[in-house]
């Protein structure tokens, strides 16, 4: 009977660990970008949580890097327009009438600050980066930390 209890507890803990990051973005449109492009050839998706992020004090870090796929950039921008509607702070850099860098500070979820960063460059190649971060730190502190670590 003890082995059964241990097995059930292990399965429950494992399930919670897997479902926690999935639930994190459930209310955001960018979730679709991670789902659609996360496992495509030529795309790098990174998802880190818990102890992997101790030095950064983040709860969740998720990123996509996509090369030579302008359609992905257009799709992500459409997702960001919907997420922007609920954002507390929005900053954009626009080039040739198209947002190339977007920063969204989203409303807190529980005790976590949420932040979306998007960047698209054209030269030397088309490269798209999408980052989603959850942290107990304020989004301004998160940006300072990211820029300092570089």
Predicted stretch roles:
Residues 1-30:
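Bacterial Sec-dependent N-terminal signal peptides
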Residues 23-112, 121-126, 139-140, 144-150:
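Polybasic/polar functional segments that serve as interface/processing modules
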Residues 133-137:
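Terminal membrane-proximal soluble interaction domains of membrane-associated proteins
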Residues 114-120, 129-132:
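Short, hydrophobic/aromatic-rich beta-strand segments within well-structured domains
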């Amino acid at each position: 009977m003890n082995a059964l209890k241990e097995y059930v507890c292990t399965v429950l803990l494992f399930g919670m660990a897997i479902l926690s990051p999935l639930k994190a973005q459930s209310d955001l449109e960018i979730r679709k970008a991670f789902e659609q492009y996360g496992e495509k050839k030529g795309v790098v998706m990174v998802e880190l949580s818990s102890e992997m992020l101790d030095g950064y004090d983040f709860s969740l870090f998720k990123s996509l890097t996509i090369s030579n796929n302008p359609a992905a950039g257009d799709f992500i921008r459409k997702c960001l327009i919907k997420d922007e509607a609920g954002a507390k702070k929005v900053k954009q850099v626009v080039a040739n009438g198209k947002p190339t860098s977007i920063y969204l500070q989203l409303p807190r979820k529980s005790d976590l600050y949420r932040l979306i960063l998007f960047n698209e460059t054209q030269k030397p190649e088309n490269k798209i980066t999408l980052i989603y971060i959850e942290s107990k730190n304020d989004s301004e502190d998160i940006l300072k930390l990211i820029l300092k670590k570089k």
